[in-house]
Amino acid sequence: MVTSPEFERGIAEFNQQQFYACHDTLEAIWVDAPEADKRFYQGILQVAVGCYHLSNDNLRGAIILLGEAVRRLCDYQPDYEGINVEQLLEQAMALLKALQQLQPEQTSDFWQQLQKQSGATNKEYNSDSLPDLVASCQLPYINRVLN
């Protein structure tokens, strides 16, 4: 399988939690993609944008985008374009389920705890406020399928 350098860059941006940059990179691919691939790219884009919304305390936007992403990516399981779609979906669904249990005022604390859990930040947070929800999920990460 051959993937474009732009696709590789978008995946790297996603995995570095540069969700807005990932959106820009993959959107350029999505626009010109064959019809059969559009939903795949759009699904990954929506996971990225959902995480971006979460990072900006937009709980409703995160829930909507992650839900749309799950619907779009489910047809591409278990893997597609060298991506472990099944694992990405599991992570996105676990995050979506946790977000659906949050109140809007908990969004910032939840995001900080997710980042702390993933090692992305050293910010202090109230570790007692949402431990079960944070333990039940993680920020999605795109893994390659090993052939």
Model-predicted segments: where are they?
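Residue-level signature for tetratricopeptide repeat
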Residues: 12-13, 45, 52
